[in-house]
Amino acid sequence: MGAGSSTEQRSPEQPPEGSSTPAEPEPSGGGPSAEAAPDTTADPAIAASDPATKLLQKNGQLSTINGVAEQDELSLQEGDLNGQKGALNGQGALNSQEEEEVIVTEVGQRDSEDVSKRDSDKEMATKSAVVHDITDDGQEETPEIIEQIPSSESNLEELTQPTESQANDIGFKKVFKFVGFKFTVKKDKTEKPDTVQLLTVKKDEGEGAAGAGDHKDPSLGAGEAASKESEPKQSTEKPEETLKREQSHAEISPPAESGQAVEECKEEGEEKQEKEPSKSAESPTSPVTSETGSTFKKFFTQGWAGWRKKTSFRKPKEDEVEASEKKKEQEPEKVDTEEDGKAEVASEKLTASEQAHPQEPAESAHEPRLSAEYEKVELPSEEQVSGSQGPSEEKPAPLATEVFDEKIEVHQEEVVAEVHVSTVEERTEEQKTEVEETAGSVPAEELVEMDAEPQEAEPAKELVKLKETCVSGEDPTQGADLSPDEKVLSKPPEGVVSEVEMLSSQERMKVQGSPLKKLFTSTGLKKLSGKKQKGKRGGGDEESGEHTQVPADSPDSQEEQKGESSASSPEEPEEITCLEKGLAEVQQDGEAEEGATSDGEKKREGVTPWASFKKMVTPKKRVRRPSESDKEDELDKVKSATLSSTESTASEMQEEMKGSVEEPKPEEPKRKVDTSVSWEALICVGSSKKRARRGSSSDEEGGPKAMGGDHQKADEAGKDKETGTDGILAGSQEHDPGQGSSSPEQAGSPTEGEGVSTWESFKRLVTPRKKSKSKLEEKSEDSIAGSGVEHSTPDTEPGKEESWVSIKKFIPGRRKKRPDGKQEQAPVEDAGPTGANEDDSDVPAVVPLSEYDAVEREKMEAQQAQKSAEQPEQKAATEVSKELSESQVHMMAAAVADGTRAATIIEERSPSWISASVTEPLEQVEAEAALLTEEVLEREVIAEEEPPTVTEPLPENREARGDTVVSEAELTPEAVTAAETAGPLGAEEGTEASAAEETTEMVSAVSQLTDSPDTTEEATPVQEVEGGVPDIEEQERRTQEVLQAVAEKVKEESQLPGTGGPEDVLQPVQRAEAERPEEQAEASGLKKETDVVLKVDAQEAKTEPFTQGKVVGQTTPESFEKAPQVTESIESSELVTTCQAETLAGVKSQEMVMEQAIPPDSVETPTDSETDGSTPVADFDAPGTTQKDEIVEIHEENEVASGTQSGGTEAEAVPAQKERPPAPSSFVFQEETKEQSKMEDTLEHTDKEVSVETVSILSKTEGTQEADQYADEKTKDVPFFEGLEGSIDTGITVSREKVTEVALKGEGTEEAECKKDDALELQSHAKSPPSPVEREMVVQVEREKTEAEPTHVNEEKLEHETAVTVSEEVSKQLLQTVNVPIIDGAKEVSSLEGSPPPCLGQEEAVCTKIQVQSSEASFTLTAAAEEEKVLGETANILETGETLEPAGAHLVLEEKSSEKNEDFAAHPGEDAVPTGPDCQAKSTPVIVSATTKKGLSSDLEGEKTTSLKWKSDEVDEQVACQEVKVSVAIEDLEPENGILELETKSSKLVQNIIQTAVDQFVRTEETATEMLTSELQTQAHVIKADSQDAGQETEKEGEEPQASAQDETPITSAKEESESTAVGQAHSDISKDMSEASEKTMTVEVEGSTVNDQQLEEVVLPSEEEGGGAGTKSVPEDDGHALLAERIEKSLVEPKEDEKGDDVDDPENQNSALADTDASGGLTKESPDTNGPKQKEKEDAQEVELQEGKVHSESDKAITPQAQEELQKQERESAKSELTES
C-alpha cells in the first residue's frame, strides 16, 4: 500500500518539489484525485496565504529540505510515506506530498496541507497558541472526519494493501472497536504501510537522507502540518480531511500497487534522492521552518506531550520521545552510515520498505495509535485530528524542524530525517513491539509485526506516541537526531535539542529499560490486553513498550543506539543511570502499564473476573510490582518447594504462568475458576504460590490471622507487597483469590498456614476428602507439622485457613470437587464430624482432618449404626455440613480467632492445626465438644442428652463446638428443621433424605453446606421430631440450660474475647445465628409447610437446634450472646420463652453481637421468623410477645451482655416477637420457597427440600455467615463490633430488609422466577428489587403474588396464620422476623458475604436456593442474601451514594411499604404489620432504611471493612461476583472502576457461581467498601449525603430516583442485560445485586415512585429533613455514620446500647417505628454502634421521616409513586425481562 502509493505518489512527488505541481502529479500517483485536490488546494493555500506558504515552507521546506535535500528519498519515501501516510489516512501521501511538495507545505499533510496552506496565516499566527487550540479543536473536529474519512481510506488502503493493512488492519480495527476510533483503525491501517515505509525510510535514509527526510517529512511534515494545520485545522481540517480523503482515496489505489510501489518507491526513491538535492536547494526556508518547527515541536513536544501526559501517558510518551530520540540518535549514526550508501540503501530500503511494509504499516498504525491515543487520552477528536493529521503532520512539522536543521546538510538532514523516521518507525515498532510485549511475551520484532495485527489499540496509542515522537519526538528526533545532528550539524534549536537530549536520555533509559519492560510487558499483556489494553493503555504501555522495543524492534535502532551511545555518550551515562532507573521504572511501568493495559483490556473486554481481579492486582501498578513479580515468583518457588510436589508443581506452574504470563496467569486461573475448571490445578497453581507467600505471611501473622483472617490476607498481601510487587499481585490476588474463585484457594491457602499445611488442609477439605484418609492424615500431619506452629500460633490462622478452605470449598470448582470429595466423604464422614463431636473426647482435640475424618467416620459410622440409617445420612450431611459449616465456622472461627476460633479451627482445621498448644485444650474441648456434640446430636435425636455436658464444655464447646457444634448446630437446627419438617413429613423424611441427598449433592455442588443441612434435616429430624417433640421441650430446657451454661461461659469467654473474642464470638454466633435463623427461617418455611404442630415441635426442636445451633454454632460468640441472652432470658425467668427468647435472644444477642442493632432483632426475628415464622410461630407467638419483653430484657441484659446488641435486640426483638406472626409470611414465602425450591430444584419434596435446601442453605448461610461474619469480624475487628454490632447488621439489615423487600417482592416474583431459575430467582430478586415500587407493588403484587402466587400458599399459610392480621403480625414479626431473619439472613448473607469465598458458590447457590427454596421459608435468607447483596449494593450504592437514598427511601419506603402493605397488611402504622411477606419486605426495608442510612453506613463501614478484608479473601470470588458487581458496581461503583473491573472479572465466577450474588453483594460491598471504606466514608459520606440528598431529592423527584436510581436501574437493566447476557446466574446475581442496587436505587426509585416517591418525598422530605436531619444527619451521620460507624462501632457497645435502648425504649419507634426502631431503632441499635446518638437523631429523623415519609410517601405515593412506580416497574420489569431473558 505504501509502496503503491509511494510509487504513484513519488512520480507526483517529483512535481511536489514544485509544490503544487508535484502535489497534483502526486495525487495522480498516490491518489490523482485525492492528491491533485490537495495539491491544487495546497497551491491555492500556499498562494492564498504566505504564512501558509511559510507553513509550506516549513512543511514545504520540510518538503524542500526533506524534499529537495531528501527529494529522492522523499520521492521514494513519499511514495512510501504517501503510501504509508496514505495508510495514515492519506497523511502519508500528504506528508509525502508535503515533503514532495516542497512548496506545497503540507503535501505530506496529505489533504491537510492545502488546508494548512489555506490556514497557513492562521497557523503561522496561531501556530503556538492555535496549534494546541486548533489541534485540540481541529483534532476534535477533524478526527471525527478523519476517523471517518481515513477509515474508508484506510480501509481501502487496507484492502489495497491487504498484507500490510490486514496485519495492521486486524489490530487496528480491533483498536477502533475497542478504542472506538474509526480513524485510528483505518489510519493505523493506512499508516501501517507508512510506518512500514517509515521503517523502510530508516533503511533508505541510510542511502538517501531524503528517504528518512521524506519519512520525517511525513512525520515532521505531518507534525508541522499538524502543528500548522492544527491551528487551521478547525477551519482547515475538514478540507484537509476531504483532501486527505481524496489523497487517501488516491492513495488507496496506490496501496493496491504497494508491491510495485515498493519497487517504484525504490526507483523513485532513488530518483527522489536525486531530486532531494533540488529540494535541498529549496530548503533555505528550512531555518525558519526549523524555528517554527521548534516552536511546533515545543508545542507538540510539550503541548502534545502535555496532552499525552494529561492522558497519563506522559512518561511513556516522553519515553517514546526519548526512545525516538534514542532511535534517532542511533539512527543518525546509522543514517550516517546509511547515508554513505544512500542510493544502495535506497534500493535496499525500498526492498526493506517492501519487507518492512508490514512493520511500517504497524508503525503507521502507531501514528494513528498516537492520534487515537490522543483521542482516547485527551482530545479524542482533537488529538485524533492532530493525532492523525497532527501526528503525521506534527511529525512532518517536527521533522520539518529537523529537516530545517537537516537543510544545512541534506544528508545530515536525511540522517536526521532517517533517524527521526527511523526513530518514529522504530518507536512505532517499539511501541508496537512494546505494546505487543505488553500484550504478550512475543518477541519484540515479532511483536512489531504482530502489533500490526494484535495491537489495534496500539495504533491509537502509537499514533499518540508517534505524536509524542513527532511532537515530543520532534525534539527527540531533533534531539536524538540532532544529538548526532548537533554533532554533525548542531543546527537544531538548542532548546529543542536540550529538550530532546533530556527526552533522549530519558527515552534511552526507558528504551534500554524497555527490553526488561518487554519481558514484563510482553509477558501476558499481549495475549490478554495487547489489543484492548493497548488501545486503552497504548500511550503508557506502548510508549514504554516502544522504549523497550527500540532496541529489540530494529537492529538499526539497536545499532543506532549503540552508535548513538557514542554520539550521545554524554546523555548515555545519564541514560544508563536513568536507564537503570528507567529500567526499573519501565519494568514497573511496564508492569503497571501491563496492569493498566490488562485493566484497560479488562474493562474493554469486560471479560473477566480476571479483569477485575487483575485490576485489583493491577491497580497496584506499583513500581515494585515487576520486582515483586520476581519476588513473588521467588517466594512462590521457595515456598512451593515446601509445598507438596503437586503443590510445588502447581505453584511452579502458577509461578511460571505468573512469571511468563504474570497477569494472564491469574486471568487464566481465574477463567478456570470461572469455568470451575480444575480447581485443584488452580488451587495448587495459584494457591501454592500464594499459600507459600501467605504461608510465610501466615507464619508471621499466625496470631493476627485469627482475628484478621481477611486482614491477614490484606496484611499478607501487604507483606507480599513488601516482599515484592508480585506479593502485591499475590496480595491483591490473595485478596482477590481469597474472594475470587480463581485464587481463593491460592490466596486462601497461603494465608491459611504454612501454605503446605494450609494448602493441604484446603486440599483435604476440597479435593482430598475423596483421597485416602492416610493421605489426608499425611497431609494433615504435614500440615500439622508445617502449620502446627502456625496453628499453635492461632486458632485465628487455622480458622482463617479453614475459612479459606471453606471459601475454597464454596468455590465453584472446589464446590464441584468438594461436593464430590465431600459428598463422598460425607457418608464416610457421616460418623466423622458427628462422631468427632461425640467422640471428640476420644479423638484429640486437634485431629488432622484426615485422621479426624477417618476417626470420626469410624466413630460416626458406629454412632450412625447407633443412631440410625437416617442419622448417618444426616451426619453425612452433618459431616459435610459440619465440615462445610466448620470450614465456614473455621472461616468464622478464624475470624473469631479466640477460643472459639481455636476450637472451631481446631476441629475442622485439626489436620492443619494440630498444634501442641491448641491440641490439648482442643482435645478437652473436643472431648467436651464430642460430648456436647453427642449430647447435642442426641438432644437433636433424643432431645434429652445432658445439656450440662454441653454447658460444661461450653467454653471449650464454644471453641470445639464452634466448629463441631456449629456444624452440628447447623445440623441440629437443620436436623431440627428437618425433624420439624420431617415430623409431619415423616414419610417425606425418607424422601427428604433422598431428596436431601440429591439436594445435598446438588447443593453440595452448589453449596456444600446445603449438603449437611439436607442430610441433617433428613436424618436427625425423624428421630428428633418423631421422638423429639417432648425431647424438644427437654431440648428447650437443656437448650436453656446449655444456653445458660454457654451463656455463662460465653459471657465469660465473650467477655474475655469481648473485644476480639466477642467479635469472633459474634461471628460464630452470627454464624450459628445465621445458621439457625436461616435454618429456622427456612425451617420456619418448612415448619410452616410442615404444620403448626411442627411449629411447636419445630419451635422446640428448632429452639433447641437453634439454641444448640446458636450455642454450638455460636459456640463462643453464640454462646456468649446466648449465654447472656439465655442467661438473661433465663434471668427473665422464661425458660421456654427463655429458650425461645434465649434462642431468639441468643440469636438476637448473637446477631446483635454480630449485627448488634438490627441483628438482635434479626436474631430474635429469625427465631421468630424461623422459629416463629415456621413452626415456632405457635410457640413463639406467645413467647414472641413475652419474648419480646424477654428479649427486651434479654436484650437489655444483652445490652449488657452483647452491649449494643441488646438495645437493638430488645427493640427489635420485642417488635419482632410482638409481631410474632412471621409464620404466615414465612409460610407464604416458605411455600413460595417451596415452590421456588421446587421450581428451582424441581424437587418433588419441595417442603423436604425447602427444608433440606432451605436448611442446607441455612447451613450454608450459617457457615457462610460464620465465614462472612468472620470476614466481617476480620474486616472489622474493630469495626466488627462497631460494624458487627451496628454497621454490619445495620447494613446487613438494610440489605436484608431491602432484600426482604426484594426477597418478598423478588420472592413473589422469585416464586415465579425462582421457578424459572435461581438466576431468575436472583433475577426476580433483581427484577423484583429493581423497583422498590414494583417491589412494593411487587411486594404488594407479590404479596398479592405471594398472597396470590402463594395465595394458594400464602392464603393457605396466611389462613394458617390468620391471613392478613396474622400476616400483618407475622408481617410485623416478619418485619421483626424478616428484619431479624433478614438481618440474620443478612447476617447470614453477610456471612455469606463475609464467607462468600468459602460459601460463595454454595452461598450464592444458597442465596439462590434460599431465595428459591427458602425464598419464602428461607425468605429471610433470600431476603437476607438479597438484602446482603442489597447491602453490598447498598454499600456500593451508599458508596455511590444511592444506598443512603434507598436507605432513607427504603426506611420511609418500607414504612410506606408497610403502609402499602397496610393496604395488604392493614397495618399502616406498622411497617411490619403489612402482609407478612410484604410487611416483611417492606417493614424490613423500613428497618433497612434507617439501618441502611445509618447501620448501612456503619455496615458499609463494617462491611466495607469486612468487604475490604473479604475483598482480599474474596477477590477471586469477588472477581466472580465482580462482573455482577460490575454491573451493580458500574452503577454503584462507577467511582470504583477497579471494583467494576473486579466485578467484570468476577462475572465469570458469577457465571459459574451464583454465590457471586452474595459475593457480588459482599464484594460490591467490599469492593465498594474497600475502595469506599476510605472512599465511602468520604465518598459514602459525600455520596451518602449526595445520595441521600440527591437520592432523596431524586427520590423527591421520584423520577430522579429513577434518574439516579434508574440510572442505576437502566444500568442495572443494561448491566443486568449485559449480565443477563453474560451470565444467567451472574445475571441473577447481578440482577440480584444490580436489582438490589436497582432495588435500592429502585427502592429509591420504586419506593420513590410508590414508596420512594412516597418516601422519596418522604425520604427526601424526611430524608432531606433527615437530609437536613437524617439526610443531613444521614449525610453527616453517614459521614459521621461511617466515621462514627467505626468510632462508635469502636465505642459500639455503649452508644449502641444507649441508642438501642433509646430506640428500644421508643415504643412508637418499636411499633410503627418498630420498623423504625427496627429500621431506625434497630439501625439506631446498629447505628448507635456506628453513629451512636447521631444515629438516634437519624433514627428519630428517620422515624419522623418515616412517619412524615409515610405521610409524604402516602402523598407522594399517590402522586409520584404511581408514575414512578410504573416507570420503575417498567424499569424493573424491563430489568426483569432482561434478567428473565438472560
Swiss-Prot record:
Annotated spans, RII-binding: 1541-1554
Record field: compositional bias (Basic residues): 528-537
Compartment list: Cytoplasm, Cell cortex; Cytoplasm, Cytoskeleton; Membrane
Keyword Cytoplasm part of the UniProt annotation: yes
Compositionally biased region (Polar residues): 157-168, 739-749, 1164-1174, 1253-1267, 1603-1612
Region (Disordered): 1-53, 71-169, 189-400, 421-886, 938-1089, 1105-1134, 1157-1274, 1305-1355, 1584-1782
Motif AKAP CaM-binding 1 mapped to chain: 607-627
Primary location: cytoplasm
Sequence position, cross-link Glycyl lysine isopeptide (Lys-Gly) (interchain with G-Cter in SUMO1): K1051
Residue numbers covered by motif AKAP CaM-binding 2: 756-776
Lipid-bearing positions (N-myristoyl glycine): G2
Annotated motif AKAP CaM-binding 3, positions: 801-821
Biased composition (Acidic residues): 446-456
Annotated membrane topology: Lipid-anchor
Pfam hit, one: WSK
Induction of synthesis: Activated by lysophosphatidylcholine (lysoPC).
Composition skew (Basic and acidic residues), residue ranges: 108-125, 226-249, 315-347, 363-379, 423-435, 458-468, 625-639, 655-674, 708-724, 792-803, 1072-1089, 1187-1198, 1231-1251, 1333-1355, 1629-1639, 1675-1699, 1734-1757, 1766-1782
Note: Antibodies against the C-terminal of gravin can be produced by patients with myasthenia gravis (MG).
Subunit note: Binds to dimeric RII-alpha regulatory subunit of PKC.
Name by which UniProt lists this protein: A-kinase anchor protein 12
Organism this protein belongs to: Homo sapiens
